[in-house]
From Swiss-Prot:
One example of a Gene Ontology biological process annotation: regulation of DNA-templated transcription
Organism expressing this protein natively: Bordetella avium (strain 197N)
Short name of any one Pfam family annotated for the protein: TACO1_YebC_N
GO cellular component: cytosol
The name this protein goes by in its record: Probable transcriptional regulatory protein BAV2207
Superkingdom of origin: Bacteria
InterPro entries: Integrase-like_N, TACO1_YebC-like_2nd/3rd_dom, TACO1_YebC_N, Transcrip_reg_TACO1-like, Transcrip_reg_TACO1-like_dom3, YebC-like
NCBIfam families per the UniProt record, alphabetical: PRK00110.1, PRK12378.1, YebC/PmpR family DNA-binding transcriptional regulator
Places the protein is found: Cytoplasm
Keyword tags: Cytoplasm, DNA-binding, Transcription, Transcription regulation
Residue numbers spanned by region Disordered: 1-21
Chain segments annotated as coiled-coil in the UniProt record: none
GO function term, MF aspect, one: DNA binding
Length: 243
């Protein structure tokens, strides 16, 4: 990864997300409510709710907020009219972007997403235009200095698909989405804390942006992430370390 640092990008991304914590909580509450509505209030038997619960924990959301969201969903209030919608598009320099939304009004949402792309130098694409460039998977990223042997042993025993160590000493563990909860529990039991862990759309190749292009791309991502109906934004862009 010449020209940029994966870990600088991760810390930069986390910092921006932490700054938007209030909006993040709103998105997680919506996700919890819909997950409970679809699969019940028990996270042990509802994998989707377990994932949302874990997100809430990582975001330091109070347990009372989580429980209220579960009760609303399981009781049939709220969430009834929400549906998941995915949009695909292009950013600066043809960078690939996936936007996952949860909405009760598709017309409103697609208009807002299209406007965010157009206003910030991108454009909304057709279904399937960039999704093939990403893989749906569970991902755990351990910072440089983590024990490679210990991470690898726990990961492979728990069913990981791949363990990759980069030039900086960071470790990436990839698994099938269905295996993500088991791996997370295995790492926690072993006292291993990932810097980042989630079920994501992982870019299969990367596009590096620098200078003005990087600034413009970050504005586009911020605009998309700032939309109320947007749950997640994925891109194949990595930013120069200086950005």
């Amino acid at each position: 990864m010449a020209g940029h640092s994966k870990w600088a990008n991760i810390q930069h991304r986390k910092g921006r997300q932490d700054a938007k914590r209030g909006k993040l909580w709103t998105k997680i509450i919506r996700e919890i409510t819909v997950a409970a509505r679809a699969g019940g209030a028990d996270p042990d038997s509802n994998p989707r709710l377990r994932l949302a619960w874990d997100k809430a924990t990582d975001a330091n959301m109070p347990k009372d907020n989580v429980q209220r969201a579960i009760q609303r969903g399981a009781g049939g209030a709220d969430g009834d009219n929400y549906e998941e919608v995915r949009y695909e598009g292009y950013g600066i320099g043809g960078a690939a972007v996936i936007v996952d939304c949860m909405t009760d009004n598709r017309t409103r949402t697609v208009a807002e997403v299209r406007h965010a792309f157009a206003k910030n130098g991108g454009n909304l694409g057709q279904e399937g235009s960039v999704a093939f460039m990403f893989k749906h998977c569970g991902q755990f990223l351990f910072a440089p200095g983590s024990s490679e042997d210990k991470v690898m042993e726990v990961a492979l025993d728990a069913g990981a698909e791949d363990v990759i160590t980069d030039d900086e000493g960071g470790i990436e563990v990839i698994c099938a989405p269905a295996d993500y909860p088991a791996l997370r529990q295995a790492f926690e039991a072993a006292g291993l804390k990932a810097e980042v862990d989630a079920v994501i759309m992982k870019a299969q190749s990367e596009t590096e942006l620098t200078g003005d292009d990087a600034i413009k791309m970050q504005k586009l991502l911020d605009a998309l992430e700032g939309l109320d109906d947007v749950q997640e934004v994925y891109t194949n862009v990595v930013f120069d370390e200086a950005q």
